[in-house]
Swiss-Prot record:
Start-end of each Sequence repeat: 47-57, 69-79, 80-90, 91-101
Segments of skewed composition (Low complexity): 1-17
Keywords carried by this UniProt record: Repeat
Name this polypeptide is given: Late embryogenesis abundant protein 1
Region (Disordered): 1-143
Signal sequence, start to end: none
Organism of provenance: Aphelenchoides avenae
UniProt feature, compositional bias: Basic and acidic residues: 47-60, 69-143
GO MF: identical protein binding
Amino acid sequence: MSSQQNQNRQGEQQEQGYMEAAKEKVVNAWESTKETLSSTAQAAAEKTAEFRDSAGETIRDLTGQAQEKGQEFKERAGEKAEETKQRAGEKMDETKQRAGEMRENAGQKMEEYKQQGKGKAEELRDTAAEKLHQAGEKVKGRD
């Protein structure tokens, strides 16, 4: 296999590696985001359930003020969940942007490798032509 083909293959493999790494980061970020959302929702549900369990009988006996406090708690939990969801969305946007940048960088690297490969091929061609010319001159000199 020629050096040019090796360089091209290495460039393609490196670009593939960049793309795989970018893909893996996006997937990992998305999984992390889903886990964050899930755990936040679960925590809010557990807190709400704990509140209901511990205050079940008391709530039935309490006045409207106790019911108002429970409603405030639910609203705060909803606000917190919404804030967390918004932050997770922002993080996902940042991750997508970073992945795009990585993809662009990989493309630029691939283009650099292609240009380097073309330059090397031209250099080898010129060297081979020069050596062939020199060999021809030597043969003519022997005649």
